[in-house]
Amino acid sequence: MKPFLIGLLAGLCLLSAGCGKEATPPPPAAFYSLHDSTGKEIVLTKKPEKIVLLSPAFLNIMHAAGGDFVAYGSSPSLDAPDYAKGKVNLGYSYQINMEKLIGEKPDLVIGLKGLHNPLASSLEANHIPLMLLSISTKDEVAQAIEIMGDVSGHTEEGAKASKEFQKEIDALSRKVPDKGMTCAVIFGAAHAVMLAKEGTIATETAKILHFQNVFAKEGASEMHMMPFSMEDLMKKDPDILFLTTMVTPGQEKKVFEEVLLNQPAWQELRAVKEGRVYFLPQNLFLSSPGIDYPKAIRCMAGQVYPEMRF
């Protein structure tokens, strides 16, 4: 009988996961996790209460998803929306005031991939998570709407806004005839003129409207821009030319005059002869319009097809 009791006690010890030791409780589940546009895993242990948006393009995305923010990066070419009033302005998106940003003690900062990567080390040193997102394409914007709905605790609202956003863009794309027309997007800055390849707002909008960018696959695959060449432009001779700039409003034509408009070869281009040269406004094409992507599509479509209503 005694050996039996000893065996019984031993079995009970095993079933209770060890005599004299308490079971370790499992770690609490994270509130949210994802891999951002850089491939980095972001894990939020709880719902963020103080979200900072480093790009003005994120403001209308977060608003559409039903979320809120405490501070934001601004733009010299865009007025802050009414729902940004009372929030902390951290300066221009490309020149964020880090002292102000860290002073806000945010529990999540959302920035643009590429532009805000250099801020990662400073934020990490202050134990502030940084999520970097790309929002150049319609699919990236649609995903960003859902992400901002998730992190702000408005998952259903974000999913609904994302679905409506995609539905509107698809309807606009179907409305425009696919005539197999080709295009080139020329980007002008104060000291340089470039040809856009893929991954810019203008090239992605053109793709939605069935315009084939003749320089999409040229040059290094990882670059969005390539050096301008009149010779290359003459060889491709696209049906449409879109011009977009990063200069002071009102100076758009001036930046192109010497390199393009005053060149004899410019007048020989088919798009110039047929009157298919269009300037794209900075407020829609310089940086991502975010939730206003359909406005960029309507703008471009309306220039090429003025007889149609968008």
What do these predicted ranges mean?
Residues 2-8:
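Sec-dependent signal peptide recognition
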Residues 15-18:
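C-terminal motif of bacterial Sec signal peptides marking the signal peptidase cleavage site
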Residues 20-31:
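Bacterial Sec signal peptide processing site at the extreme N-terminus
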Residues 31, 40-43, 118-194, 215-216, ...:
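Extracytoplasmic substrate-binding proteins
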Residues 35-39, 88-99, 220-230:
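Short helix-initiation/N-cap motifs at beta->coil->alpha
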Residues 53-104, 108-113, 211-214:
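A short, structured surface patch at a secondary-structure boundary
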Residues 76-79, 195-224:
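Alpha-helical, coiled-coil/dimerization segments enriched in small aliphatic residues
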Residues 98-114, 128, 229-243:
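Proline-aspartate-enriched helix->loop->beta-strand connector
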